[in-house]
Amino acid sequence: WMNDARSYVPPVRINQVMRALTLSRVIESKSPDLKEGDLVTGTQGIQEYAVAKPEDLNRVDPALADPSRYLSVLGMTGMTAYFGLFDVGLPKPDDVVVVSGAAGAVGQIVGQLAKIHGCKTIGIAGGEEKCKFLTDEIGFDHAIDYKSQNVAKEIRRYAKKGLDVYFDNVGGEILEAALFNLNRGARIVICGAISQYNTTAVQGPRNYLSLLVNRARMEGMVVFDYAERYGEAVEKMAGWLKEGKLKSKEDIVKGRVTDFPETFLKLFSGANLGKLILEIEKV
């Protein structure tokens, strides 16, 4: 969202409000569709107040789930996981699904959706605490600590015949490790590349010929392409939340708008566990 390069959205300009997903309360409305007190989500950015058109907002139903869930599992994060896995990854029951950034906002949901679908799941995360979270709290079959283990060897240990779906949130060396361990017909979902966003030289996959040898494919996905189907995903995932099949963990930081830069940087150090949310405290 900030890189001055061709992308799926224009970069944020200098002196423009920093783009971000928001959960807000309506304090005044001239629209018959929204009233004072309604909770809404949108992309109003890092600011305390915003003027918005009703068509750019989505009303939140607190009776369906805790409002914070609309920034995570029932928001863009959940939509990314749902459509990335099911529409691009095309998992089949008993497939081996490997997820990088698995303790992050999208990754943890992808793994749980794969389990609901009957897949074997392997999560890649950094540190013992995150790996224990994956296996002990949200049901991944195996976890790999990229900080202390050889990722390629560990994937091979848990997926003897190779992986069937790799959901990539990280890029770089971990993507390389996945490419070394593809099953025939594997699908790689390119969702993000957090390891590459701040580098001066982006590391591309050197062993891409593995796609040829294994008749595999690698495809990028942008969640906005599925906007007309968000309702489908929200309905299904809200049901799984109520049934206890799906869990959502948010890492909520309470502070002011001025705390955003420090909070944002947690994403790049791996300090967050789950969806990172800055909750603006009332003055």
Predicted regions and their residues:
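Glycine-rich beta-strand-centered segment in the early N-terminal region that forms part
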Residues: 2-46
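Short, well-ordered loop/turn sites that connect or cap secondary structure elements
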Residues: 33-34, 91, 182
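A structural motif shared across PLP-dependent enzymes of the aminotransferase-like
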Residues: 43-56, 229
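Mid-domain Rossmann-like dinucleotide-binding core that forms the NAD(H)/NADP(H) cofactor-binding site
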Residues: 71-149
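C-terminal hydrophobic helical "lid"/dimerization subdomain
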Residues: 227-283
